């Protein structure tokens, strides 16, 4: 979260689920929906989770030690197979369009974290 605050990143893209084929693939670094966690001096609140057919969008309110507030969108792709690659690109393109729309809505061209 320190990097998110320092670079004012407003979009995070995840291509993996936390657990795939029974193995931990990604550490869960965010609070559950409606909850808030502190990471050092940074507060992260999960304000919303929306499930789409192939991905999930979370909206976080991030507040730094200096009380700077950011809205951060996290997109998590849910249809990547345990082995190989997706058979089609249509779901990835849907998520990509949603990511670009969020960037436009935020009026922000800061880095996207992948």
Curated annotation (Swiss-Prot):
Broad EC category: hydrolase
Zinc as UniProt keyword: no
Pfam entry (one): Y_phosphatase
Coiled coil: none
EC number annotated for this UniProt entry: 3.1.3.48
Catalytic reactions of this protein: O-phospho-L-tyrosyl-[protein] + H2O = L-tyrosyl-[protein] + phosphate
TM region(s), chain numbering: none
Binding-site residues, substrate: 82
Tyrosine-protein phosphatase domain: residues covered: 1-114
Entry's Gene Ontology molecular function annotations: protein tyrosine phosphatase activity
Family matches, as Gene3D superfamilies: Protein tyrosine phosphatase superfamily
InterPro entries in UniProt: Prot-tyrosine_phosphatase-like, Protein-Tyr_Phosphatase, PTP_cat
Organism superkingdom: Eukaryota
Family: Belongs to the protein-tyrosine phosphatase family.
PANTHER family: PROTEIN-TYROSINE-PHOSPHATASE, RECEPTOR-TYPE TYROSINE-PROTEIN PHOSPHATASE
Name this protein carries in UniProt: Tyrosine-protein phosphatase 27
Species this chain originates from: Styela plicata
């Amino acid at each position: 979260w320190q990097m998110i605050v320092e670079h004012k990143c407003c979009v995070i893209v995840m291509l993996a689920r936390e657990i795939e084929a029974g193995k931990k693939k990604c550490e869960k670094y965010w609070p559950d929906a409606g909850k808030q966690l502190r990471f050092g001096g940074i507060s992260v609140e999960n304000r919303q989770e929306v499930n789409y057919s192939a991905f999930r969008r979370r909206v976080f309110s991030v507040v730094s030690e200096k009380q700077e507030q950011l809205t951060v969108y996290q997109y998590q792709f849910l249809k990547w197979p345990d082995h190989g690659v997706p058979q089609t690109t249509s779901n990835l393109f849907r998520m990509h369009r949603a990511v670009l729309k969020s960037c436009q809505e935020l009026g922000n061209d800061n880095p996207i974290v992948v």
